[in-house]
């Protein structure tokens, strides 16, 4: 079983990020088990980490304005350009009709990864 969300594709990953930004119940359910390393692109990893960092500090999702400010502070122009493009793509999915399906699949995937990692760690003890 793959440890990343690559098998679901880039559009699916954008919908996960859209869900993180738009659905309070989803972010509350998944914030502790979703890892940026599960995403395939550096841009998606950066977005997920930024959303998580903001959520852990302020207990709510960042707005588009907050993300824009964070992007402006980036030093890496190549990554900055990629993040802007991914955020545009993500924003197109904010009201996608299949977000419930995406959220369920993502939650199941993350729970399985967490369980798998816990089992592997216990074997190493």
What are these language model-derived features?
Residues 114-125:
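Short secondary-structure subsegments characteristic of cysteine-rich extracellular domains
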Residues 1-109:
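Noncatalytic partner-interaction/assembly domains of nucleic-acid and motor enzyme complexes
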């Amino acid at each position: 079983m793959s440890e990343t969300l690559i098998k679901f594709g880039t559009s699916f990953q954008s919908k996960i990020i859209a869900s993180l930004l738009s659905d309070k119940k989803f972010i509350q359910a998944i914030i502790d088990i979703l890892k940026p390393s599960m995403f395939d692109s550096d841009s998606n990893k950066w977005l997920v980490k930024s959303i998580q960092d903001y959520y852990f500090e302020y207990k709510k999702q960042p707005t588009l304005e907050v993300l824009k400010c964070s992007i402006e502070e980036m030093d890496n122009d190549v990554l900055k350009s990629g993040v802007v493009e991914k955020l545009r793509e993500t924003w197109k999915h904010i009201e996608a009709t299949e977000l419930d399906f995406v959220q369920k699949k993502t939650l199941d995937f993350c729970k399985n990864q967490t369980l798998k990692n816990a089992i592997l760690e216990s074997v190493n003890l």
